[in-house]
From Swiss-Prot:
UniProt pathway: Secondary metabolite biosynthesis
Name of the molecule in the record: Zaragozic acid A biosynthesis cluster protein 1
Protein species of origin: Cochliobolus lunatus (Filamentous fungus)
Lineage top rank: taxon: Eukaryota
Functional description taken from the UniProt entry: Part of the gene cluster that mediates the biosynthesis of squalestatin S1 (SQS1, also known as zaragozic acid A), a heavily oxidized fungal polyketide that offers potent cholesterol lowering activity by targeting squalene synthase (SS). SQS1 is composed of a 2,8-dioxobicyclic[3.2.1]octane-3,4,5-tricarboxyclic acid core that is connected to two lipophilic polyketide arms.
Amino acid sequence: MRSPWADDVEYQKDPLFLNYEKRIWDNSTNQTTFSWHKDTREIASSSILALALVHDVWGPVIAACSIDARWAASDIYVIPTNSTVVFSNTTDSLMESLRHSNQGNREANIAKYGLSRNPIDIQLEWAEKLNRKYIFDLSVKPSQRMKAAPNEEINAIETFLMDIIPSMRVDPSVSTLLGLIVSDSISRTINTTRAPWGMVEEVDSNGSWNYSEVVRNSGNENRPNPDDDNGYVMRVIADRYGYGFALRVRFGVLYLESLPNGLVPIGDIFVLVWDLN
């Protein structure tokens, strides 16, 4: 499967083709299966691909989605406390805000906040964790079961409005579920301690960025380590591409109000980038 970013100059020079292993097609049933892959090329260190094999929607369909460095071009910032799972800088805008400090402080801040020098750098084990996490949960489910899975997985996320989706191309439950899987998985991989601080941004009419430090206090007494000072922030705002995302508005929004199993909700707004082929 080719990378969905067909208009990307670098990908045009070196397009990504995912070679499916034969076992992906072996023992095919009427179940929908998900698998996650990482683009290991040096120029694509920030790309992760999710594949869905759907059997009962007008024949076999492959749905692809990509978490790509283009997120950084739109607006994403992540300050994780668990650096073994996700590495990311917080977009060029935050790096620019660090530039005003002297070089010593800048390097210290990069180390302190776990910032990468790439726009978004997701480690290989991130995809591996997704595969392991959902092998008995969301990776393999009958189609009818999948259609109910989003509400079962995170019942606090507002329901997508899928009325404009071309259902003859891709089952709406596939695109919905992919979005929920990724938002949930990102939040699950972040350290579960309470985040007492955060960086928030405002974009003025000229497109300039303004950052300020804020105190995050959700009032959730069940959160572990409430005095932990290694906070995190995760926020995604990006454009949408491809089939499956022609919603009532130009983009869709996931509100992560709470997560199952007592994990800490992120509480910010996720607008996810997908391209379904």
